Amino acid sequence: MKLRNIIISLSIFLLTGCLCGCTDWLDYKPKDKQSEEQQFSTKDGFYAAVNGIYNRMAGNSLYGKYLSYEMIDVLAQRYTVNLTGDDSYSKYLQALINWDYSNETVLSALSSIWGEGYSTIMNTNVILNNLEKDMNGEGAGVLPEREYKMLKGEMLAARAMIHFDLLRLFGPVYFRNPEGRGIPYNESTETKILDILPTETVLKDYIIRDLKAAEALLLESDPVLTEGPRAEYDQITMDNSMRYRQLRLNYYATVLLTARTYLWGGDMDNALAEARKLTDDPKVRGFFPAVDSGTLLGNSVNPDLMFSTECLFGYYNKDRGLIYDYTFGGSNTGNKLLVPRAGYVDGQLFANNPGDYRYQSQWENGSTLDGNSSKRLVKFREITDTAKDEMSGSTSDENQILQVQKFHGTFCSLMKLSEAYYIAAEATATEGSEVYDMTAAWNYLQQIFDSRGAVRSSNNFRDLLTKEYIREFIGEGQVFFYFKRLNKAFDNAYNGRQAIQIEIIPGLPFYDDKENVTEEAKEKRFIAPLPTNELDNR
């Protein structure tokens, strides 16, 4: 989809009680200013438009599938797939796991990511434009200044986040070619051709600029700073515009996203500075407490498999259990099944760590497509309603507990507090940086080990950090980008596909007939092609 052909279309999420409890949509395609002005003539109209952005981000083309648990994790060699299946979906998975970006279904999925990404970005620009009008007297003037700042901060962060992930997917390995072809950065509400900018320009001049502006606005306005995420329904006022902050790009999520972007650009000093805003503030851990092992492991009815108390940002999916059923296990034993190879999870990923809470709660016995014993991921499993039935007629305090239980059963994580500790650890472990301090690096990593019931199983820092990214973020979209950032090999210890260093398998698109694959050849795994129609007529 060409940027110039994207029609401004605000997908309005209808507000009924809970912020994200409804799935009805109103598609709005203004052909004149009157309908746009009507949309933004009330405070509810602004919130409906903003909720529409988050709902689009949670769609399959972005973070609800391709950029979380499916395409991006298959590219990251997390699973085995049916290598002999002849149906279109099997061929799609075969192409992904071999980094074959020429497959028609893969190209279609990439085009969907690109098109939906830029369409959503344009809609954030429409909202940002109307926020300015509302504040400077050109609009209806319906928003208090605090809410103007909060919504503007969220939309700047959303615009930056989507651009950043498009850059990470379609751009080069940054440290190898920062001046390489990047992507357009769209700040306009008009349909026009935008220049494709160098990667470094997109990252430093636009993405980080927007994130720092968002941080400043949210620091002055976000209730998460004083009241935490407030993941419960307000039964008194029925106004949830300031609640469920984990479903919004709140201040803390924006800080983590900024740290993530600095790390991508190799700026360890600033990455550490941003990460420490989260790791060094005791209030943050109070608002986003580590999962309680007793509650997690002792609860067979409705455990918090997503570790939602620690999540800074994610999305709502009332049908989360279907992801598990159709993709990771449940009733699925067919070609769509994604499970790691036999022996990988317990024999390598969690080797010497059988007490790790993630191993004990997020994985269960299953089998590969060829019938060998394996482990299957259950973090997306449906949470039963037994506890809800037992609480009928309960007191208001119990009702609040009930709301939290319902929340963690429908929540899917995109950002966890633990990532701030990993970023701080990597920054301080980088030789040559001004913040190099291996004692500090190990301390940051140890804090996560302690919160997971894990032990430090070796003195190889990079090996343990790599395994931590896989253990922590499988199904959440970060593992592929971790390997891309480092141009790192998927050797035996890090791939769930097969017990071999993947890079030396003959027949893969980048294989160069050498035992040791070149860095240039390895880089090809990680760079998705821009849609053909985006490059036409430029």
What kind of region is each of these model predictions?
Residues 108, 277-434, 487-538:
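Elongated scaffold/linker segments in the mid-to-C-terminal portions of large proteins
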Residues 1-31:
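Bacterial Sec-dependent N-terminal signal peptides
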Residues 90-170, 197-202, 216-218, 404-412, ...:
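Conserved, well-structured interaction surfaces
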Residues 123, 210, 217, 274-277, ...:
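Alpha-helical solenoid repeat scaffolds, predominantly canonical TPR units
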Residues 21-76, 275, 317, 442, ...:
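Membrane-proximal, proline-rich intrinsically disordered regions
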Residues 37, 67-76, 81, 172-179, ...:
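Short, surface-exposed recognition loops and adjoining beta-strand edges that mediate ligand/DNA contacts
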